[in-house]
Amino acid sequence: MKSIKRVEKVTSHLSDFGQWYTDICLKAELIAYSDVKGFIIYLPYGYALWENIQKYLNYEFQKTGHQNVYFPLVFSEKLFQKEKDHIQGFSPEAAMITSTGQKELFEKLVIRPTSEVLFSQYYAKIISSYRDLPKLYNQFCNVVRWEKATKPFLRGKEFLWQEGHTVHATEKEALDQTLFAIQLYEKLGKELLALPFVCGRKTEKEKFAGALITYSIEALMQDGQALQAGTSHYLGTNFAQSFQIQFQDQDHQNKYVHQTSWGVSTRLIGALIMVHSDDEGLILPPYIAPIQIVIIPLQPKNELVQAEAKKIFDDLKTTYRVHLDLQNKTPGWKFSQYELKGVPLRIEIGARDLAQGEVTIFQRYNNSKNNFSKNTFKAEIPKLLKTIHDKMYQKAQKHLEANRRQASTYQEFKDHLQKKGYVAMSISGMDAEIKIKTETGATARVILETPLITPNCPVTDKKAIQTVLFAKSY
């Protein structure tokens, strides 16, 4: 790829939001396309974002005793069919291996769309007593789901994710674990991604296949469409009964275990791009950015300038993810390149800066430049990074709140949907939900734990039972 291609202007998000998003994914060198639709190549800069999400989660898992494992990519179709609700939910997008070379397989193999059945089969083998509980397992892996419409990070035939699978003696322990996971994801959004989420319980129609309860985190993109960014499921004893996962309690009674599963994926990277970026390219929150600070000597052949740039690099590299750019490119090209890549801070050092005892620091999130004393600027960097993160979160939160409405009539609901964003309405249940999706394209995101807006459902005129947040979504 020629260097000029990496600094071409991206499409304006106002003229074509979808192309703007794709341009950023490609031109910021996050991904490349493979020869099979829906299977992307994660380039180093894009994969580093996922690695930083993994690091954050692993740090949290170490505190709570969750252990990482890795289970196989394939399992038998017979195993897949053991939980009837689960297979009905995933069969349409499950990919199968039916032959090897010229030989047809006696039994089809399922390529992992999710791993509940594999974990359940294993748990049935190793759990027999209350002393074996709880089991707190997690794996980072890839999954394959044969999606029709694909988009980098947001919806692919293959994607990367984290999936937790836990087993407990009681319903309460499992429900607590289900809430722990969704609260962890909310914390991940706030502390690492600068992403505010709406968190809540899914409706019966939208819950995970095979679960009793599903919670989700929902993000709102700049174009007003919602994105489900993570889920946590209480599976009850559904899989335990299908796979006969039983234990003997302290009273010597045989009981079924209670299970949970929960996960986030590379969809978080898609949300990160769509929520924060602008027409110049990526804008990355500093704590997830692969490069937090780039140092650009304005006259790289000037020995004094180069020496000062290297000194700054050496001073910062043990604390931050720093890159010193000594390429034989113009400063303007480098500025555009790192703005496209969303690097939070850029330190510029030139002959004039040296003479004045200063450095210039550019902040990507608001495209501002300020001069700092070269003797004291290092103390300002952690403050700048925190301010950038906080401001990015606040901006996204403000956008979310400004695009959250409620409706008392069905017509008002439709009118609000035209503006995009979230619309809350009290409904009678699944019948109303199905009609809303059919007629407007909006889907239920989460149930709100708030009083009813109206006593009757505006869609069916039946008694309203819950207030639900709706949106059009990716």
From Swiss-Prot:
Keywords: Aminoacyl-tRNA synthetase, ATP-binding, Cytoplasm, Ligase, Nucleotide-binding, Protein biosynthesis. SMART domains: ProRS-C_1. SUPFAM superfamilies: C-terminal domain of ProRS, Class II aaRS ABD-related, Class II aaRS and biotin synthetases. One of its GO terms (biological process) is prolyl-tRNA aminoacylation. It is found in: Cytoplasm. InterPro entries: aa-tRNA-synt_IIb, aa-tRNA-synth_II, aa-tRNA-synth_II/BPL/LPL, Anticodon-bd, Anticodon-bd_dom_sf, Pro-tRNA-ligase_IIa, Pro-tRNA-ligase_IIa_arc-type, Pro-tRNA_ligase_II_C. It holds the Pfam family ProRS-C_1. It comes from the Bacteria. GO terms for molecular function: ATP binding; proline-tRNA ligase activity. It catalyses: tRNA(Pro) + L-proline + ATP = L-prolyl-tRNA(Pro) + AMP + diphosphate. Its EC number is 6.1.1.15. GO terms for cellular component: aminoacyl-tRNA synthetase multienzyme complex; cytoplasm. Consists of three domains: the N-terminal catalytic domain, the anticodon-binding domain and the C-terminal extension. Belongs to the class-II aminoacyl-tRNA synthetase family. ProS type 3 subfamily. Homodimer. PANTHER family: BIFUNCTIONAL GLUTAMATE_PROLINE--TRNA LIGASE (PTHR43382:SF2), PROLYL-TRNA SYNTHETASE (PTHR43382). Catalyzes the attachment of proline to tRNA(Pro) in a two-step reaction: proline is first activated by ATP to form Pro-AMP and then transferred to the acceptor end of tRNA(Pro). This is Proline--tRNA ligase. It comes from Phytoplasma australiense.
